């Protein structure tokens, strides 16, 4: 039996089988070492930077959180220990990251004068291996520059988790895939539009009458056909060429019938569902003839089912601290006079 490589005819592989891979674990879910003890503090179970990034990219996701924040802030009554401005910062951190932190400010005699919000992204719970019980406020990723705050000076509000009780996690994690999908659909459409309303193509040329200089000029023109060059015309002259000497083979067609609108609508509905905020309170434009229903009724139900439980979570801190830090008034809608 002769060897194929010894005949001078190189063996060619014309068939290649590949796959797109398996589902990858999204970074915002954390890793197998959730709340790992590094000797100083416990690591966070959820990537905080990813949560903030999605807040700035997801339209409905951001709108729902800000709607809750505005209603909560409107019902808060400033106390001797907490101002409205500090409460708004605290509530925003609590809604987005699942954690809210207040640190006490004391006078020289140790009396608490008030509370200031601490950004939850930089707060870490000290581990049992550390000699003191409290929290680290990380100014950077270097532990040497962190501020240590005793536990007695911190009010930690957190949304509950099923696997750990060190940190809270936001209750909307199940909807982050939809927020990612919504953002990806918008990003793809924007890049598709900037690219000249095409997703790329292959230039297949068999015309030998075009020299290398002309080919280089043609390539330069194709490279410039983006953004402001979308409507640029390309003139190519080949007197003895064939009609099919140059072909444009689209890599993928993205026509008006693509699923962009369906993806946007379905993912938006998912985000509204996970946040349980009525669309009429978020500025959503109705598409059905019946509209979005009575906004006043929706606001009253929303306040009873969503806002009051959050208020109750804040009020529990009053009992834990032994003083009135939080105070709320009932949520009411203004009546427009005739």
Where are these regions (language model features)?
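Short, surface-exposed beta-edge/turn micro-motifs
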Residues: 97-101, 133, 199-200
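Flexible, gly/proline-biased loop segments at the beginnings
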Residues: 1-125, 166-169, 254, 291, ...
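Structured surface patches comprising rigid loops and adjacent beta-strands/short helices at the edges
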Residues: 112-128, 147-160
